[in-house]
Amino acid sequence: MSGSKGVSPPGYAAQTAAAPASRGGPEHRSAWGEADSRANGYPHAPGGSARGSTKKPGGAVTPQQQQQQQRLASRWRGDDDDEPPLSGDDPLAGGFGFSFRSKSAWQERGGDDCGRGSRRQRRGAAGGGSTRAPPAGGGCGGGSAAAAAAAGGTEVRPRSVELGLEERRGKGRAVDELEAGAVEGGEGAEDGGSSADSSNGPGAVLSLGACCLALLQIFRSKKFPSDKLERLYQRYFFRLNQSSLTMLMAVLVLVCLVMLAFHAARPPLQLPYLAVLAAAVGVILVMAVLCNRAAFHQDHMGLACYALIAVVLAVQVVGLLLPQPRSASEGIWWTVFFIYTIYTLLPVRMRAAVLSGVLLSTLHLAIALRTNAQDRFLLKQLVSNVLIFSCTNIVGVCTHYPAEVSQRQAFQETRECIQARLHSQRENQQQERLLLSVLPRHVAMEMKADINAKQEDMMFHKIYIQKHDNVSILFADIEGFTSLASQCTAQELVMTLNELFARFDKLAAENHCLRIKILGDCYYCVSGLPEARADHAHCCVEMGMDMIEAISLVREVTGVNVNMRVGIHSGRVHCGVLGLRKWQFDVWSNDVTLANHMEAGGKAGRIHITKATLNYLNGDYEVEPGCGGERNAYLKEHSIETFLILRCTQKRKEEKAMIAKMNRQRTNSIGHNPPHWGAERPFYNHLGGNQVSKEMKRMGFEDPKDKNAQESTNPEDEVDEFLGRAIDARSIDRLRSEHVRRFLLTFREPDLEKKYSKQVDDRFGAYVACASLVFLFICCVQITIVPHSMFMLSFYLACFLLLTLVVFVSMIYSCVKLFPRPLQSLSRKIVRSKMNSTLVGVFTITLVFLSAFVNMFMCNSKDLLDCLAAEHNISVIHVNACHVVESAFNYSLGNEQGFCGNSRPNCNFPEYFTYSVLLSLLACSVFLQISCIGKLVLMLAIELTYVLIVEVPRVTLFDNADLLVTANAIDISSNGTSQCPEHATKVALKVVTPIIISVFVLALYLHAQQVESTARLDFLWKLQATEEKEEMEELQAYNRRLLHNILPKDVAAHFLARERRNDELYYQSCECVAVMFASIANFSEFYVELEANNEGVECLRLLNEIIADFDEIISEDRFRQLEKIKTIGSTYMAASGLNDSTYDKVGKTHIKALADFAMKLMDQMKYINEHSFNNFQMKIGLNIGPVVAGVIGARKPQYDIWGNTVNVASRMDSTGVPDRIQVTTDMYQVLAANTYQLECRGVVKVKGKGEMMTYFLNGGPPLS
C-alpha cells in the first residue's frame, strides 16, 4: 500500500511516488492576482495589465516600481525557526512569472495571459476537497464508501474589533476616489450605535426616524465599548490634545488680560474683579507649565480640563457681577468665546462640553436677569442672548462632533491597517517558514530575485541548478514498511509517516543534513548543502545511526518488525528545481544514483558506505567489508567497494560528548528551549490518549498540551501592543517638521498634497446646513433687537432662499437616488471638488456675514452728542450722560424713534451686530474642509470690512449706545432724584469691537490650524500604515504565489492556519483518482557528466525545458482537472480527481482529461525530438482507483498520495513500451465506454502484482 520508492538520479525508472493533491503553480491572473492580492486594491499579473500597475507598455520597470521593489526588499521578514530568514538583499516586487522564455518562444509555444500573445489560459487553483472514502474494491465506483474525516486547512484571521463606530462605505464614489489615490475616512456613531452623521453613502435613502436618531446621537458622548481601546485612543491623541489644551490656555490668558485691560482703562477699579482675573491668569499659567512637563500623563488630562472649566466659570461669575455700568449685553462676547473654545479646544467628551456650554449660558442669563431686572427692554435682550448662546452651543456641537468622529475614525482605520498588516506579517512569516522548509534559502532567494527583476529575453527557461562538490548523500529506506502499512487505516498510515519523518527532520537538523525529498517510505538527505562542511561524511554517518535508533523505538512502540536500511556515498551533486510548476528541491548526479544503490544493496539496521565516504571519515569509525555487489547488480557492475559501519571509535565518542556538552551550554546561555520538531499527533493511535509516552519523549516529541500553551496568543492584544508602541514612538513635532510646512500646513511632497486634496468630505452638506442655521439665528436675533424694516425682511428672505438652495444641492450628495441625474451631477461636482466646495462655503459664509451687519445701514446715524450739545447749548466735548438724563427728549435705550430730526429708527444695541458678526465667524469655522490659511484670509476680510464700517460710516451708532448705557445706569441709580451721581464708564464699543473680533479671529485661526494639522497628521500616519500594510500584503501575495507553486493551496492553507488543533492531521481518502507516470525511458543514456556539458548541467537544462513544456500543457484550461504531483528524475507524475472541484463521479471527465493529457505529452515529445535533434522515448502508465492523500513532515511538509492505485500506475510506466501509453483494465473500461481507441496488449507480469491484463491507448474518440 505504500508508495513505491523513487529516486531522482537521471535515468532511474520510478516505481511509484507520492503526490500532492491540489493545484498550484504560477496560475493566471484571476487565480493569483484577484484571489490572493485583492486586499491591495489591484490584481497582480505577470505582464501587469492590472489597474494599479506601474509597468510601462514596453515592459520597462519604472523608477516607482524600482523604489517599490527596494521597499519590499527591506521588508522581507526573517524567521528564527529551523531556517534563517531570507536576506534583505532579495528584491521583491513587480510582475510575477516563473518562465523566462524569449518573446518568440512564447508566441510559438504559448505563455501567460499577460499581453505576450498567449494562446493558453492559466487555470485557477482547485480548492481543497472534502473527504471521500475509497471503496472496498480496487476500481472506481465499486463498494460502499467508508466515512473519513477531512482535515482541510482554514485560514484564521483575527476577529474584527467593534470600535463603536460604523464606517461609511460610499458605493457610488468609493471606486473613483480610490483610483484617484484618496485615502478616505468614514464616520460613525459611538457606543455601537448607528452613524450619527448620515453614515449612508450615495444611493441610501434616509428616513425621518433615522435622521432623528442620528441627530440624537450627536449629543451623546463618544466612547469605545472597550475600556482598553478607549485608553489606547486617548494615548493616540494625547500629544495632540496636550497641544490643544496648551493652546486653549494661551487664548484664555489673552482673554483674561483683555478683560483686565478693559476694566483698568476706566476707573474706579474693582479690586475683587482684578484679583480674580489675576488669579485666573496665574492658575492657567501654572497649569500650562505643568501640562507640558514630561511627567504629565494622559490620566491627568481629565483633571486639567475640569480644573480649567472651573476657572472659566469663576471668571464668568466675577466678570458679570462686579463691573459697572451693568448691562444685559455685558460679557456676551467672552461667554461666546468660552463656550466655543470648550467645544473645540478643550479635549473633553461631548457630554461635558454640552454641560459646560449650557452652564455658562445659564449663568450669564441668570446674572443678567438679576442685575438688570429694572430695564424695560430686558426681555428682548434676554431673548437675543438666548438665541446667541443657543447658536454658539449648536455651532460648538457641529464643530466638536465631526472633529471627534474624524479622530476616532482615523484611530479606527489606523488600527485596522495595523491589524491587517500584523495579520499579513504573521501569515507572511508562516509562509516564509513553510517556504523555507520546502526549498533551501539560497534557492528561494534566487527565485524571488528573478521573479521580481526584469528578465532578458532568453531562448530557454532559467534553470535553478547549483553544483556542489564534496558532499555526502544518504538514502534510507524503511524495511518492513509494507507490513506496517497493511495493519494501518488511512489515517494511521499518514500519522505514522508523519511522526517518523518529523523525527527524521529533527535529526537531520541536528546532524547538519538537508532533507531533500521523501519518496514513499524512502528518505534521503545531503550534508554539505547549502554551505560546505568538512565533516559532511561524519554528519551523514551520525544521521544514519540516529535514524536506526529512532526506528528501533518505533519497533518497540508499535510491535511491528520495521528497520532502516541506510546507504551513504560522497561525491558531487547538482541541486535545485526543474520545471515551472510544483517545485521540489532535488539533487542529480551519478553520485546520487550510486548512493541510491548503496541503500538498495545495504543491510537492515546497518549503515552501508562507499570507499569515497570512508576516506572522509578519517578512521573515526570501525568498519567491515560491505560486499554490496553481492546484493545489488549496479554495485557489482561498477565494481564499487563498500563497507558497513560497526561502531565509532573511542576518540570519536569523546568528540561527540564534547560537542553535545558545548551545545547544551550554548542552549542554556541563550535562555530558551530548543524549537519543537515533533509531529502534530505523536503515535496517538498507539497511546490511546493525550499522554506522550516515555519512548516518544525520547524521540523528541512534546506533549500537545505544552504546544497549546505555546500557541495561545491573542491577536487583538498583539495589535493593541503594537499600536501602543507605535504611539509612544510617534513624534508629532518631527512629523510636522519633516512632512508639513509650518505656516501653510501643506505637505512638502506634491504627491502627498495631491492625495490629501483629493479626499472627499462627506459632511459638506452638514457644514452648509449648520452655517444656514447660524444665519437663521442671526435673523432671529436681529429681528428681536433691531427695529424692523422692509429691507430687512426682503434681504433675509432672499438670503434664506439662496441658502436653502445651496443646502438642498449639497445634501443631495447623501441621498442621490431621490433626485434627477442633473442635480446628482451638480451635487457631486460641488462636494467632490475641493475648489468648488470651498467656493460654495465662502459664498455661504458671505451671505451669513452680510446678514449680520447689513441692517446697520437702516439705522439712524445722527450723533447724539451733537443733538445734546445743541439742546443744552454747550460744546460737544462737555456733553456727558447726565445731559441725556436731563434732556427734555426721550433719549433712552428703550426708545427706537428717530431723534435729531431723522426719521430712521434708532438702533440702541449695536453691539448685537458685533455679536452677529462673531456668530458668522463661528460659521466660518464650521467648514472643516477649508484650509486654515483660507479661513484666516476669509476671517481677516470679514474683520477688516466690519471694523471699517464700525469705525467710519457707522461709528455714531456705537458712540450713541455707550452714552445711552451710561445714562440708563445713572437713571436707575438716581432713584428719580434730580441729582446726577458719579458714574462709571465703559471702554468705548468702537475700541472694544476691533479687539474682541481680533481675539476671535486669532482663536479661530489657532483652532483651524489645530484641526488641519491633526487631520494631516492622521492622514499621513494612516497613509503610512496603509502603505506598510499594502507592501506587506504584496510581499505576502508574492510568497503565497511562490508557495502555491510548491504546495497545493489547500495544503498551504492548512499549514498556515494560526489556530489548528494539535491532533489534526491533513489527509484525504479519494475514491476515484486517475494517476499518470510518464518517464523518458532513455534519458539515462543521454545524461553524461563531461566537462563539455558543464558536468551534466546542460543535460539537466534540456530536461528542464521538457518538463517546462509539460507544465505549460497541464496549465491549459482543458486540463484544469489535472494536478501535477511532481517530477522524479526524468519521470513526470500527475493525477486528477483529488478534490471535489476536479472529481466528476458521473461523467468521469477527470479520467478522460488525464488520458488526453497523456496523448498530448506524446505529441509534445515528438515535437521536441524534431527541434532538438534527439530521440527521446516516453513510456506512460495510467491507472484509476482509490488513493490516500496526506501530508507528512510536520515542520517540513510534503504532500503525498499512497495506495495500490499509485503502485500499479507506476508499474504501468516501468513495464510499458517506449512511445506507448499503457493502461489497466479499470482505465480501459472507462475510456472504451467513451469511444477512445485502445488495443489489448495482453497479460503482463508486474512485480508484486502477478499477472495483469493491460491495454495500449492509441487515440481519442473519433471526430464526429
UniProtKB/Swiss-Prot annotation:
SMART domains: CYCc (SM00044)
Cofactor-binding details, from the entry: Binds 2 magnesium ions per subunit. Is also active with manganese (in vitro).
Catalyzed reaction equations: ATP = 3',5'-cyclic AMP + diphosphate
Comp. bias (Basic and acidic residues): 25-37, 156-176
CDD domains noted in UniProt: CHD, Nucleotidyl_cyc_III
Subunit text: Interacts with GNAS, GNB1 and GNG2. Part of a complex containing AKAP5, ADCY6, PDE4C and PKD2. Interacts with RAF1.
Name of this protein: Adenylate cyclase type 5
Species for this entry: Oryctolagus cuniculus
Name of the gene this protein is made from: ADCY5
